[in-house]
Amino acid sequence: MAGSRTYRTKVLVLDKTKLKETDLILTMLDERGRQVRAVAKGARKPGGRLAARCELFCTVDMLLAHGRSLDVVSQAELMEAPLGAAPDYETTCAASAIAEVARVCSFEDAEDPFTFAITQRALALVGSGLDTAHMDLLVACLLYTSPSPRDA
């Protein structure tokens, strides 16, 4: 087999799906804007080496091994947790919406580095503690729209 079996990449964890008793399937956005799905073996164990490093909305430096249909997480190092250790409900809901948009807008075979950068920046803004009124205005500005007087 030619080439390397493993590769290192920086990813944002967008979604986690339970697999068996101790494993997770992670849906991630890599730094090239490509969607990556990988199995994190033992990530559901409380004392597992991947348990705290593969949390939702976190930026993680990962070493992945190519598998048959899914990659396998060999190593993970937490780089940034923009929402902090224990985010509140509103923050988690906002970050979840951002992650869902990123998941739907990214594909396994199409690269778009802008998707990674804008998702990472949006999660950082959500984690910075903006109140909901400012967040609504920020989203309106990003969408190039202005709120009409009727909406107020």
Regions found by a protein language model. Name each.
Residues I98, C141-L143:
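A residue-level signal for conserved active-site and pocket-lining positions in enzyme catalytic cores
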Residues D136:
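Anionic-ligand-binding alpha/beta catalytic cores of soluble enzymes and soluble regulatory domains
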Residues A2-A117:
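A surface-exposed, charged beta-strand/loop segment in the N-terminal or early-internal portion
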Residues Y144-A152:
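Single conserved hydrophobic/aromatic residue that forms the stacking wall/gate
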